[in-house]
């Protein structure tokens, strides 16, 4: 547990614990802040750009980030992942659109799925000839590094080219256990990139960001965007 309960400004806690300041928000900031719905032809699929799609494979995460752009759906009551029927329809949509070459698995956190369901999704996508790249967006290696098991890395290796975007926010998250999980993924030939959200009171100073970026590079994770 990285959270210091005695520190009201703990940078890890501020990512996940509610703050009264969140109540000061406009409706458009909470309903669909990045406009996914207008680009969603099917349940669980966002087709915003011609050659790539976002495939939402689950509603669940190991933690619930206060800044999540899909907070309206993440953690909602229902099945752990979208219904298999909906997922099959979304994959059929991808198969029927040859212009799509890049599929990003998101949600929720795809690595919160069990190995069997995750591999079923990867196998279905890899069987589509025009899908060149599969990406997985996840915070699981950061908050639950024990999820990155030898069995999981063996599964992921079967579906190259496969990339992972990991969600890092503060240098305190780069524990030895997290670095080991990243090493397992990197050793499996998976390019690792970091997505970082700029958060007031968490990482909005040069020193913290420098520490984070240097720690990421040392863990074989390329800082991708801030």
PLM region spans:
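Conserved AdoMet/S-adenosylmethionine-binding subsite of the radical SAM
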Residues: 87-102, 111-226
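Iron-sulfur (Fe-S) cluster-binding segments and ferredoxin-like electron-carrier domains
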Residues: 68-80
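Domain-level signature for proteins that mediate thiol-based redox and metal-cofactor handling
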Residues: 44, 78-79, 95
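Short, structured patches in soluble enzyme cores that scaffold and shape functional sites
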Residues: 59, 69-72, 107, 138, ...
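Flexible, acidic/Gly-rich N-terminal and inter-domain linker regions that tether
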Residues: 1-48
